[in-house]
Amino acid sequence: MSLPRHTLAIQALYRRVLKLHRKLPLEIKALGDQYAKDEFRRHKKASQEQAVRFMQEWKIYADTIEQQVNSQQLNVLGKDLKDEHIESLTEEQLGQLYSLQEAALKPDSSEPRDI
């Protein structure tokens, strides 16, 4: 039995994201992989409208990461969020964004620290 076409498209996008993450620094890769896994799992039972928006946003993300990892400036990763985009987020999304920011800015515990 074959999977529906939209399921195959979602799986292909998920694999593309994970493949792109392999080109990122290890600590960012781990964070990105976990976030992608959680988000794709969280949207398994999304409505058709939500699924379309979800796919659009993850395609934009994948295109952005692909551009950044293939550019000569490997130290430039990520993208600033516009105020209107932040203002359109729900409380839950703002909480997720804040958690992601905290995890991304957490100091690497493997590096020696000054006392």
Swiss-Prot record:
Cell compartments where the protein resides: Mitochondrion matrix
Biological processes per GO annotation: mitochondrial respiratory chain complex II assembly; succinate metabolic process
GO cellular component: mitochondrial intermembrane space; mitochondrial matrix
Keyword set, alphabetical order: Chaperone, Mitochondrion, Transit peptide
Keyword presence, Mitochondrion: yes
CDD domains, A to Z: Complex1_LYR_SDHAF3_LYRM10
A family per Pfam: Complex1_LYR_2
InterPro entries assigned: SDHAF3/Sdh7 (IPR008381)
Similarity comment: family membership: Belongs to the complex I LYR family. SDHAF3 subfamily.
Role played: Plays an essential role in the assembly of succinate dehydrogenase (SDH), an enzyme complex (also referred to as respiratory complex II) that is a component of both the tricarboxylic acid (TCA) cycle and the mitochondrial electron transport chain, and which couples the oxidation of succinate to fumarate with the reduction of ubiquinone (coenzyme Q) to ubiquinol. Promotes maturation of the iron-sulfur protein subunit of the SDH catalytic dimer, protecting it from the deleterious effects of oxidants. May act together with SDHAF1.
Subunit structure: Interacts with the iron-sulfur protein subunit within the SDH catalytic dimer.
Stored PANTHER family: DC11 ACN9 HOMOLOG, SUCCINATE DEHYDROGENASE ASSEMBLY FACTOR 3, MITOCHONDRIAL
Protein name per the record: Succinate dehydrogenase assembly factor 3, mitochondrial
Organism the protein comes from: Nematostella vectensis
